[in-house]
Amino acid sequence: MLHFKTWPALLTWLGLSVVVTSAGSSYSGSSSTYPKREIANISVIDTPLVRAAERFALQHSNNAVYKHLMRSWLYGVLMINANDTLSRNVDLEVHAISALLHDLGWDSTGNSPLISPDRRFEVDGAFAARSFILDHADGRGWEARRVQLVWDAIALHTERSIAYYKELEVQVVSRGISLDFSGPGFGVSEDDFATIGKSFPKNDLKNQVNESIILLCETKPQTTYDTWMQPWGDNYVKGYNPIGKRRIDLIFEHLS
């Protein structure tokens, strides 16, 4: 894994220098002009759209998932603050909304309008977040590029071998989420990591992840075959059978 301090050189080499504009936003100028509030002693962006996203996330999440969303957002904020390239270039509103809404595809309420019968949960979440933005008075003024960044950040947040080479916002969202499973890194100190954990304890994260992925393997197994989720189906779901549905099966079936 690349050390956090190597990001600027890597980004230059990849040609991923990002110029963040304020077009379509309710606020203009640098990120320092956004209104702020403190959560767990961390200063975060505080726009009406971010507040609405937090409420929307709470509405469509149980307590365990909501705490995971908040931790993921705050880890990302600390990563941004610790790196000059990120702090100069990351769109804080895009990052906040992406992090807060990244697990909408886990909404387990009955007949949720956010959940499709045939798409991966990451894609359901991406579409739900896009609809949320475009349904909000402030979000309707967003330029298409910002909306697409949110979609990409959510759709790719579990595919780190891709997300880590996308735009900065997409990278930070995925890396911030990953810290909830791997522990402090990417510029987030052990002390700051622990402070976030005290405000939003993750004692229930393991069970929640297992329950959410098992439910997907039971109710939408075709969206989990040949993905990182397949081991949950293989190990915990009776009758789960990916044979014949994996890419390797299709390749050998149709190619001579």
Identify the residue ranges that each predicted region occupies.
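Acidic/histidine metal-binding catalytic segments
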Residues: 87-92, 137-153
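Divalent metal-dependent phosphate-bond-processing catalytic cores, especially two-metal-ion Mg2+/Mn2+ enzymes
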Residues: 24-35, 60-63, 70, 74-88, ...
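His-Asp-centered metal-binding catalytic motifs of divalent-metal-dependent phosphohydrolases/nucleases
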Residues: 91-111, 125, 129, 151-160
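Active-site flanking loop/helix segments enriched in acidic
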Residues: 50-68, 73, 77, 105-112
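An active-site-proximal "capping" alpha-helix that borders the catalytic cofactor pocket
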Residues: 72-74, 119-136
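Fungal secretory targeting signals
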Residues: 1-26
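Short alpha-helical hairpin
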Residues: 34-54
